[in-house]
């Protein structure tokens, strides 16, 4: 089993780059968007449907999988990919973000974090080692260190303390992971923290780069800050990351944010927004959002997007989708999710083509005008 990342082309005007990941025999073109399958399912889609959107890699969540179905189940089935019959690549985050979002239900110290299950209140204690052990059983190709994600408006002192704790945990995660056979086929990413503070972001990036992880994630963004703040942080922190390694921005799928992040050299993205918004009646198109619940679509015989090649757009009108929503049919979230996930993959393919043809700056301006 193996992992390689090659930069194939750099934009002449920005830091955008075209790349290729090969992980355990699976090729992934970058920049890439990963649909989120939190609980071992991308909501409303079968693995075959996911594959048909041309998604090569999906994300699952350690916190949720530890709670349900539980590690004993996943161990019996040989990991989450076999459990759900997914043949592509997978990344699992450590569950740190979910644990820290519980706020009232958790207690943090330098050893780890104690929390109560949001399902039944039962107690759990995540440590760097226990998270690694869980991710080894879950068995994703890419795995993440336990980290502490602070709020965007947290104080300097709090963010600094959380950053030091993140570094300590990253070191412990890596030391344990590297001592196991799993390091031969599971690849561990370090998470850069530091909030909105330039000096802390620089320190975090340099500390983690010195630990020599196979890839790096920019954490602590898309947590309430403005798009301008996100872009400013990215433009600074990317100066200190390793350009030879994939760089992953967690929790982002807004086209504006992806375009800005790719401009700074980000390679990987994930977010629940395309699937969640689909279930709530919002279809993404290259000309903006279609809110299919609007009564104006009741008699509309056009498809969601003329140039889209997804199953939904090849077969069904806006009027039919509007009807499915009004009658609360199960087919509605399925068809909408197929479209939105396929939209994200079409968007990323167009974006990659613009880098290959060295017209990314023009493409970014054009897409910004269409969306905003």
From Swiss-Prot:
Native organism: Brachyspira hyodysenteriae (strain ATCC 49526 / WA1)
EC number(s) from the headed UniProt entry: 2.4.2.29
Complex formation: Homodimer. Within each dimer, one monomer is responsible for RNA recognition and catalysis, while the other monomer binds to the replacement base PreQ1.
Region annotated RNA binding, chain positions: 275-279
Transmembrane segments: none
Hydrolase keyword on record: no
Catalytic activity: 7-aminomethyl-7-carbaguanine + guanosine(34) in tRNA = 7-aminomethyl-7-carbaguanosine(34) in tRNA + guanine
Residues binding Zn(2+), per UniProt: 308, 310, 313, 339
UniProt keyword list: Glycosyltransferase, Metal-binding, Queuosine biosynthesis, Transferase, tRNA processing, Zinc
Record-given protein name: Queuine tRNA-ribosyltransferase
Gene Ontology CC annotations of this record: cytoplasm
This protein's encoding gene: tgt
Binding-site positions, substrate: 93-97, 147, 193, 220
GO terms of biological process kind: queuosine biosynthetic process; tRNA wobble guanine modification; tRNA-guanine transglycosylation
InterPro entries named in the record: ArchSynthase1/Queuine_TRR, TGT, TGT-like_sf, tRNA_ribo_trans-like
Known cofactor(s): Zn(2+)
Gene3D superfamilies recorded: Queuine tRNA-ribosyltransferase-like (3.20.20.105)
Superkingdom as given in the UniProt entry: Bacteria
Bound cofactor: record note: Binds 1 zinc ion per subunit.
UniProt pathway: tRNA modification; tRNA-queuosine biosynthesis
Family: Belongs to the queuine tRNA-ribosyltransferase family.
Entry GO MF terms: metal ion binding; tRNA-guanosine(34) queuine transglycosylase activity
Active site: 93 (proton acceptor), 270 (nucleophile)
Enzyme class of the recorded protein, top EC level: transferase
Function: Catalyzes the base-exchange of a guanine (G) residue with the queuine precursor 7-aminomethyl-7-deazaguanine (PreQ1) at position 34 (anticodon wobble position) in tRNAs with GU(N) anticodons (tRNA-Asp, -Asn, -His and -Tyr). Catalysis occurs through a double-displacement mechanism. The nucleophile active site attacks the C1' of nucleotide 34 to detach the guanine base from the RNA, forming a covalent enzyme-RNA intermediate. The proton acceptor active site deprotonates the incoming PreQ1, allowing a nucleophilic attack on the C1' of the ribose to form the product.
A Pfam family recorded for this sequence: TGT
């Amino acid at each position: 089993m193996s992992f390689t990342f090659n930069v194939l082309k750099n934009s002449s005007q920005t830091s955008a780059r075209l790349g290729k990941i090969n992980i355990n025999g699976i090729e992934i073109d970058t920049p890439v968007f990963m649909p989120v399958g939190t609980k071992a399912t991308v909501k409303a889609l079968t693995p075959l449907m996911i594959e048909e959107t041309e998604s090569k890699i999906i994300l699952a969540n350690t916190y949720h999988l530890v709670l349900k179905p539980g590690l004993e189940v996943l161990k019996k089935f040989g990991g989450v990919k076999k459990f759900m019959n997914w043949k592509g690549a997978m990344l699992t985050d450590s569950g740190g973000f979910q644990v820290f979002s519980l706020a009232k239900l958790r207690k943090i110290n330098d050893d780890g974090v104690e929390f109560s299950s949001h399902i039944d209140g039962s107690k759990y204690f995540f440590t760097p080692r226990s998270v690694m052990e869980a991710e080894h059983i879950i068995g994703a190709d890419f795995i993440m260190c336990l980290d502490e994600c602070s709020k965007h408006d947290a104080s300097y002192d709090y963010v600094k303390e959380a950053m030091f704790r993140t570094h300590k945990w990253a070191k412990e995660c890596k030391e344990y992971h590297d001592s196991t056979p799993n390091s031969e086929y599971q690849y561990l990413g370090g998470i850069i923290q530091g909030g909105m503070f330039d000096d802390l972001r620089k320190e975090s990036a340099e500390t983690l780069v010195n630990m020599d992880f196979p890839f790096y994630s920019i954490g602590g963004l898309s947590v309430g800050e403005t798009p301008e703040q996100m872009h400013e942080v990215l433009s600074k922190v990317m100066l200190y990351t390793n350009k030879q390694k994939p760089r992953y921005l967690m929790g982002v799928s807004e086209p504006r944010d992806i375009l800005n992040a790719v401009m700074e050299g980000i390679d990987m993205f994930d977010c629940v927004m395309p699937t969640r918004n689909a279930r709530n009646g919002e279809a993404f198109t290259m000309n903006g959002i279609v809110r299919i619940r609007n009564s104006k679509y009741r008699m509309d015989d056009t498809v969601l997007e003329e140039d889209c090649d997804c199953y939904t757009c090849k077969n069904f009108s806006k009027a039919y989708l509007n009807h499915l929503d009004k009658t609360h049919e199960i087919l509605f979230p399925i068809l909408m999710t197929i479209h939105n996930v396929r939209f994200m993959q079409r968007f990323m393919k167009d974006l990659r083509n613009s880098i290959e043809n060295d017209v990314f700056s023009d493409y970014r301006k054009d897409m910004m005008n269409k969306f905003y």
